[in-house]
């Protein structure tokens, strides 16, 4: 089955380029492609940027390769029952490059449904297919009345339902179900990990000489007698094969040797080991003029620690523009409350963000919004304003309640002076009906009324690329309007050039076709990144399965998206005392498989679209609680238990020690609570406005952020799980500079545990980064006592 590959590693995207683009070279680091069982079609521009794609593919014994020059695609079909990791070579501009490709066969699992009668159509849908109601049809092949389908699944927890003659039904044969937040339930199935040969490629460290650098690795698997063979190693220097003569093998130890010109500039080294049709993790080492990432002032996008600000709810720095909209049915929480760009500037100058430790600000949309209140379409039809910034009526003007364009430019300049970056929130999906674009170019937008007479409103899955969010919010039709496509991609680039900002958070990504993101990123690379040697970070928002999210994450589209699949497992894991960290670890491993260890995906605890963590932790709301909207207006949560702050600190310790980019939503650092929109967007509080628990939370969150900033293994390291159960999650992250062990205890009781660290690490001293204590391990065993609802972060030397 031919399809565009949805599972491409997103780790180290344009930021991990080999060097600033030179003529006739590829600057993007080509990411590994996860192949499907049959055939996979890849758009070459999703792999790397080039002015011309005059490529010639070199035959490979493991794959049938078909290059469609007209469509700029390559069709890859595995042959000879190949599994594992390999590279496909191609020539471009008299140079040879490699595409890493990975083939892994997954076990299939059977789902069955026995209806009472004879339905016309039965479909399976769930988290594993982004809740698509059509693409997993179930069949009754033998006429016994039982409809069946087998699908490949990784270990993990999956919510699902059956779609029977246009009705959603839970699995009657499965008693395990959970609320879905929409007044109904989803069935739940857990796929446990099977016993298999567990392989891991460890980093052992580096050895620097005057004009040479050795990088050492160690391959571990269940068969202790198995030694590494040269043909089992896949090693890349940027996008080229690492010279075989510079690879040393001693039993299970591997050394990559670099010297001379190979050490100049910015480079990425990648290595993995194949064995019996399986491959190890891929280790990546970033170099800047021979210095390993984390040992110099050179920064990449992996160093980002993002702080999300909703302008109107952050800080009022200019009271003269604090003008709420007047309407007799409008409540305060849905109106403007005074925050502005000057308020953000004030907090930058005050040093708030420096002290907190964040280095990147994602700021909600600053474009001009309507001055009128509008009523939401769904019941109970409350009135809102555009205080949030997502009702744009201009493509170039700044909202007057927030400031003006000069202030926006000054804010970026001030942030850069303080060593910080600015990400604008960009809305590409829609405009407000008052926007002149809608009045002057109605043909740029989709139709509100569907051919069957229904309104195309909030049909998020059925009409994903055309649905309107409200009757007064026209959705662009980029598929049928090349003029709209050109205008809005040009406009996004204009914002970057005009303000000198560092990237975007993109709204509603899955409701915008891939062609938009491909054209935008092409323009950003050709007009900004390459000529200015500047890394632009683009992170998107997509609610859906991991395949759908990943379909937008590659070198030709976005650097990242928010990792909602990981979030959806993490929240109940931390808050339900009976939930096991094992399921969270399954999802973590799935994330690595799709996006890589060194990915740029955004990890969150809260967002402006989510119920705040503290509302759950304090017991005000259950996960997917259908009362959340009512609580937001009529019974706003408040924090009643001091223990809830400890639960938040534990989650923040997790958030700030895992791979990816941590995203702090304003108020997270003080333990702000809130139900659903707009209660999760309360006005931020500072200084003496905080109680003692909030002040202590702010202090500890800041300490955790600085631990991440100070330790490169937490930004560039691998991930090795040592323990995951109902109480403890312990994982070790290593890069060429150091090893950091994180231990999380969510139990109500103190825990004493003995952790076994790989003996090849040869640990001599353990340094507790929380309290400064040091102790010696017993060979490769660490005996640790950890209080209830607490974390430990240990530096292993």
Residue ranges and their predicted role:
Residues 300, 304, 312-499, 519-531, ...:
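Substrate-binding/active-site clefts of carbohydrate-active enzymes
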């Amino acid at each position: 089955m031919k399809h565009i590959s949805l599972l491409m590693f997103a780790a180290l995207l344009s930021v991990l380029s080999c060097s600033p683009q030179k003529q006739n070279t590829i600057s993007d680091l080509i990411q590994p492609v996860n192949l499907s069982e049959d055939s996979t079609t890849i758009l070459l521009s999703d792999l790397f940027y080039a002015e011309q794609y005059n490529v010639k593919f070199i035959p490979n014994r493991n794959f049938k390769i078909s290059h469609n020059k007209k469509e700029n695609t390559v069709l890859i079909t595995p042959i000879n029952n190949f599994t594992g990791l390999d590279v496909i070579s191609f020539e471009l501009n008299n140079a040879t490059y490699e595409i890493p490709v990975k083939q892994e066969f997954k076990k299939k699992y059977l789902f069955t449904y026995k209806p009472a009668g004879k339905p016309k159509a039965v479909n399976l849908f769930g988290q594993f297919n982004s809740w698509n109601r059509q693409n997993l049809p179930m069949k009754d092949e033998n006429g016994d009345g039982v409809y069946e389908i087998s699908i490949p699944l990784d270990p993990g927890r999956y919510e699902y339902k059956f779609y029977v003659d246009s009705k959603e039904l839970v699995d009657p044969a499965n008693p395990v179900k959970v609320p879905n937040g929409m007044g109904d339930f989803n069935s739940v199935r857990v796929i446990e990990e099977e016993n298999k040969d567990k392989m891991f490629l460890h980093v052992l460290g580096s050895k620097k000489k005057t004009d040479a650098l050795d990088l050492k690795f160690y391959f571990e698997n269940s068969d202790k007698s198995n030694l590494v063979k040269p043909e089992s190693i896949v090693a890349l220097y940027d996008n080229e094969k690492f010279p075989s003569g510079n690879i040393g093998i001693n039993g299970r130890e591997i050394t990559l040797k670099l010297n001379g010109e190979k050490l100049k500039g910015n480079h990425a080294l990648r290595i993995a080991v194949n064995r019996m049709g399986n491959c190890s993790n891929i280790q990546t080492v970033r170099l800047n003029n021979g210095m390993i990432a984390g040992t110099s002032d050179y920064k990449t996008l992996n160093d980002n620690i993002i702080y999300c600000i909703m302008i109107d709810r952050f800080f009022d720095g200019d009271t003269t523009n604090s003008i709420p909209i007047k309407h007799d049915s409008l409540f305060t929480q849905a109106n403007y409350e005074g925050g502005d760009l000057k308020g953000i500037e004030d907090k930058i100058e005050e040093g708030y963000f420096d002290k907190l430790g964040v280095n990147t600000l994602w700021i909600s949309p600053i474009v001009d919004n309507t001055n009128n209140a509008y009523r939401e379409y769904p019941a109970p039809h409350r009135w809102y304003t555009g205080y949030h910034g997502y009702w744009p009526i201009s493509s170039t003007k700044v909202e007057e309640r927030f400031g003006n364009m000069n202030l926006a430019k000054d804010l970026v300049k001030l942030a850069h002076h303080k060593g910080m970056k600015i990400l604008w929130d960009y809305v590409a999906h829609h405009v407000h009906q008052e926007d002149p674009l809608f009045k002057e170019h109605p043909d740029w937008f989709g139709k509100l009324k569907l051919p069957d007479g229904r309104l195309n409103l909030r049909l998020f899955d059925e009409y994903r690329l055309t649905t309107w969010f409200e009757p007064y919010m026209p959705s662009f039709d980029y598929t049928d309007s090349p003029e709209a496509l050109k205008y809005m991609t040009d406009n996004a680039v204009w914002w970057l050039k005009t303000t000198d900002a560092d990237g975007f958070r993109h709204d509603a990504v899955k409701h915008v076709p891939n062609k938009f993101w491909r054209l935008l990123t092409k323009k950003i690379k050709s007009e900004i990144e390459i000529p200015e040697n500047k890394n632009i970070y683009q992170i998107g928002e997509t609610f859906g399965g991991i395949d759908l999210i990943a379909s937008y994450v590659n070198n030709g589209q976005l650097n990242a998206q928010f990792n909602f699949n990981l979030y959806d497992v993490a929240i109940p894991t931390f808050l339900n005392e009976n939930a096991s960290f094992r399921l969270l670890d399954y999802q973590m491993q799935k994330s690595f498989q799709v996006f890589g260890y060194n990915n740029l995906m955004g990890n969150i605890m809260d967002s402006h679209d989510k119920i705040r963590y503290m509302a759950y932790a304090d017991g005000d709301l259950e996960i997917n609680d259908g009362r959340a909207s009512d609580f937001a207006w009529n019974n706003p949560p408040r924090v009643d238990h001091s223990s809830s702050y400890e639960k938040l600190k534990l989650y923040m310790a997790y958030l700030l020690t895992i791979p990816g980019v941590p995203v702090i939503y304003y108020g997270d650092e003080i333990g702000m609570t809130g139900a659903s929109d707009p209660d999760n967007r309360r006005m931020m509080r500072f200084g003496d406005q905080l109680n003692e628990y909030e002040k202590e939370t702010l202090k500890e969150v800041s300490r955790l952020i600085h631990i991440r900033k100070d330790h490169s293994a937490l930004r560039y390291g691998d991930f090795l799980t040592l323990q995951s159960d109902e109480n403890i999650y312990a994982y070790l992250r290593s890069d060429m500079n150091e090893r950091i062990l994180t231990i999380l205890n969510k139990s109500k009781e103190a825990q004493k545990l003995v952790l076994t660290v790989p003996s090849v690490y040869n640990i001599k001293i353990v340094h507790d980064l929380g309290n400064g204590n040091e102790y010696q391990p017993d060979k490769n065993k660490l005996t640790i006592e950890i209080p209830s609802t607490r974390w430990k972060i240990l530096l292993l030397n």
